[in-house]
Amino acid sequence: MANPNLKQVNIQNNATFPHQQNVTRSTESPGDPKETMEAVAPSPQDPSSANSEPQEMTVDIKNFRRPGEKTFTQRCRLFVGNLPSDMADEDFKKLFFKYGDAKEVFINRDRGFGFIRLETRTLAEIAKAELDGTVLGNRPIRIRFATHGAALTVRNLSPVVSNELLEQAFSQFGPVERAIVIVDDRGRPTGKGIVEFANKPAARKALDHCADGALLLTTSPRPVILEPTEQYDDEDGLPEKLLQKSAQYHKEREHKPHFAQPGTFEFEYSSRWKALDEMDKQQREQVERNIQEAKEKLETEMEAAKQEHQLMMMRQDLMRRQEELRRLEELRNQELQKRKQIELRHEEERRRREEDMIRHREQLDIRRQPDGFKSGFMESREQDMRMNEMGTRGAINIGDSFNPVTAISGNQGPTQMMGMGGRVGAMGPDGSSKMIPDNGVMPNERFSEGGPLQMGSPVGGQTGVDSPQPQQHSPMLVGAGSVPGVLGQSGFGRGSPVGGSFDGPNNKRRRY
C-alpha cells in the first residue's frame, strides 16, 4: 500500500534517462533509506517494460536541505518572467507543485512576471534548471533567482570573526537568514562578508545604526563598514537568446574574434587601451599600498594607545581604590570615636548607678539596724545635747547666789543617763553620795577633785530613798558657791573663779 504522504513528482533528464521519472516527496521518515529513497527500475527479464513504463523514484525533500540551512529564505525566491497575461494563481502554483511547498506567490499579469518562494535553495535551483524556457501560451518563460534586497556587504572584518559571530552580531537588528565570511582559495579570511536579512526594514536599520555609530565585533576598536550588496548573476550570465538583435549588434558581430595585427589601426588603439588599463591597475595598486600602510600604522598606534589607555585605567583604578581606602579609614576613625564616646557615656552611667546603689544600700542598712542600737544612738545624741546645755548654763550661773537650804531640802529625782533606769549620784569627799536636786541646780561636787561620781548613793544624808516625784530630765547647771555639809572641800576646779580658771561657755566635754 502506498504512503498517502508521498507525492508523485516528475523529473525529466533526457541526457541520463531516456524515459520520464516520477519523483515522490516524503515527509514521514527521513531516517529510513528504504522509505525515503526507492528506485523502481524495469525488470531485466522484461525489456519491453523499459520502453513502456516510466521509472518511479521516491525522494525525500529533506535530503535536499543542507545541515543547518534555513527554509523559505530570500535565496529560495525565484523570478518568473514572460508569463501569459491570462495566467491564474492556481496554474502558477501547479507549475511548481512537484518541487515541494511554495510560499509568497505573486503575479503581475499586466507586466507578465511573478515571484514564488520554495523551501530550500537546492529545490529552487532544480526548479530553475528544469522550468527555464518552458513554453506557456506560445511564450517561453524565463526563470532567474530574485534579487536579494536585504543583503549587505560587510568590510573591515577582523581575522578572528566567524560566520556564527557575524550572525550573532547582526541579529540585534532583525532576523538573519545567512551570514558568511568570504575567504580566498586557501581558506584565509579576506576581511569581507555578506549578511542577508529576512526583510528590508532590518537591513535598513543595520545600515543606519552602523553609519551613525561604530559596531565592534571584537575587543579591538575596529568598526565594521556596511554597504548594500551589488547583485551579480554569475551563474547564468547573458545567453545568446536573450540578446536584442539591434543594428549595433549586427555591426559589431560582422567579424569573428581575432588578434590584431601589429602596425594596424586596431593594434595601435588596442595598445592604448591596454596602457590605460595598466595605468589604472598601477594606480589602484598604489592606492591599495597606501591604504595598507595607513592601516598598519593605525594598528601600531592603536596598540600603543591601547597599552597607554590600560595604564591610565589602572592608575585611575588605583587612585579610586586609594580614595576609597582613605574614606573607609576616615569612617573607621569616626566609628572608633563614636564607640569611645559611647563607652565613656556607659562608664559614667555605670559609675552613677553604682553610687546610687551604694547610697541605697547604706540607707537600707540604716533602716535595718536593731532597735537597741537606734535607742543608744538617740540617747548618746541626747547626752551630747545635755552637755552642751550644761556648759552654757554653767557659764551663765557663775555669779548667781546659791541657796544651800533649797538645794539640800528639795526633793531630788533620779536622772536617766545613757538609757539606764537607776539613779545617778555623786560621791563626796567623805564617801557620801549626792543626787541632783529637783530645782535643776547641779552641785559643784560633780566637778570636784575629791573623787569620781557614784551611782545609786543618797543625796544630802538620805539613804537612797526614791523621791516620790516622777523622773524628769533637768538641765544640769554649774553652781558658783560652796554649800556646807553637801559639797566637798574643793568646789569647781575649772568652772569656779575661785578654785581655778574659767574657760568660758564653750568648754565642753569630748564626745568620745
Curated annotation (Swiss-Prot):
The keyword Protein biosynthesis does not apply. GO terms for biological process: regulation of circadian rhythm; regulation of DNA-templated transcription. Residues 1-29, 46-55, 464-474 have a biased composition (Polar residues). GO terms for molecular function: RNA binding. GO terms for cellular component: nuclear speck; nucleus. Transmembrane segments: none annotated. Residues 76-148, 150-231 form the RRM domain. It is found in: Nucleus speckle. Residues 1-56, 451-512 are annotated as: Disordered. It holds the Pfam family NOPS. RNA-binding protein required for the formation of nuclear paraspeckles. Binds to poly(A), poly(G) and poly(U) RNA homopolymers. Belongs to the PSPC family. This is Paraspeckle component 1. It comes from Danio rerio. The gene is pspc1.
